[in-house]
Amino acid sequence: MKEQIEELKRYAVRLKSGNNNLGSGVLWKPKLCQKHKLYVFTAAHVIKNHEDIRVEFERDGKKVELPADEFIISSQYQKEGEWWDVAIIPIDYNYQELPRYRVAELSYDLNKILKNPQLVMVGFPQEGYIDKSFRLSMDTLECEYEDVDKSIETIKYKFVVPNIDNSDKNLELGGFSGAGIFTQIDSEIVLLGIHKGALGENAARGNLLGATADFIRKMCHENNCDTPEKPGEVNGNL
């Protein structure tokens, strides 16, 4: 998985409002682009009740900054801490060379995930913010898959990074909310979900939660967005 991290950085999104860093997100490029050319998946609590939201990502070593003219928040999400914590930002920006990746379907992929539970996300922790460098403000968080509750469409995973001070885990994880959670299946990079936050108010035990890719797909379909293909409908080209 480590050799794929450089590729994953291409999809990493920072969300801002004015001078405030709101959190992270992940770019997704649909196969046919029938509705929009690109989408950002993020956590609903990252952008809800904010105005003048901007999307930032890197292309060819340069930062691209675009306005989030519209966004869709899950109708099942009401306030921070609740389940179904997903938002979608459609973007009409032409990024032809951006490779597509597959979005997981748990009923199809779970057995392989259990055999290879390593996960990784790329986000923008608040403690790592560098004003002059978008690239160096990115950071990675390696995790291991733990479990899923399909009734609330939520996955549980545990971070395995050894260099986070146990007393400061809540602080150091701030800003990762909304980042894409990726796994590797048969050498293919696959989006497993969207990072929500720590389990409870204290992250000291390392338990984290995220919305499943299945819920992202369902939300895209219900809101007339381009919908991620199911396994067998697209081949990863990372």
Indicate where each model-derived feature is located:
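Protease-domain processing segments flanking chymotrypsin-fold serine proteases, especially trypsin-like
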Residues: 1-34, 218, 230-238
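Short Gly/Pro-enriched turn/cap motifs at secondary-structure boundaries
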Residues: 3, 16, 77-79, 169-172
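Serine endopeptidase catalytic core focused on the charge-relay Asp
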Residues: 9, 13-22, 35-37, 46-161
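A glycine-centered beta-loop-beta connector
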Residues: 19, 32-38, 181-190
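Short beta->alpha transition motifs characteristic of CBS
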Residues: 43-48, 123-125, 174, 192-201
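Catalytic nucleophile loop of clan PA
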Residues: 26, 167-195, 204-207
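Terminal helix/beta-alpha structural elements that buttress the NAD(P)+-binding lobe
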Residues: 153-165, 211, 217
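C-terminal cap/linker of serine protease catalytic domains
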Residues: 1, 192-238
